[in-house]
Amino acid sequence: MGYTVKTVAERTNLSPNTLRYYEKEGLLPSIKRTKSGIRHYSDEDLEWLGLICCLKNTGMSIKQIRDFVDLSLQGSATLKARCEMLVDHKRSVEKHIEQMNLHLEKVTHKIEFFTKQYEDFTS
């Protein structure tokens, strides 16, 4: 089944311009077009787009995602390299989560501090 840019944009909450940009950057290399040039996305393209969004939303750069896509296009010979790339990215995400948890603890502590200050002030 084929999906138009508009349909994919609605399903993914990405703008049509973002979808075109991802294609231009080589992140979606298998998008088919009609004879008149209209893009048609397949279910497999939507799966790829889901992975691309996941990687981007967790801090992977467009260049790194393109490198991952390029490796994927080379087939099974690059499975190990792709796995290593994702393991490295996972470590980076975990480190970021640790840092964010430290910030969250500090904010929580300040909320508790100011709540107590306010309660003492108003009683």
Write out the residue ranges for each language-model feature.
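Flexible coil/turn residues that form the inter-helical turn or adjacent wing/linker of helix-turn-helix
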Residues: 1, 15, 58
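Arg/Lys-rich, alpha-helical DNA-contact motif
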Residues: 4-10, 29-32, 43-123
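Short glycine/proline-centered loop/turn elements that form peptide/ligand docking sites
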Residues: 8, 15-18, 35
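Conserved active-site tyrosine of GNAT-family acetyltransferases
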Residues: 22, 41
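Glycine-centered, phosphate/nucleic-acid-interacting loop/turn motifs that mediate DNA/RNA or nucleotide
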Residues: 26
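Short, basic, alpha-helical segments at the C-terminal edge of helix-turn-helix-like DNA-binding modules
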Residues: 37-39
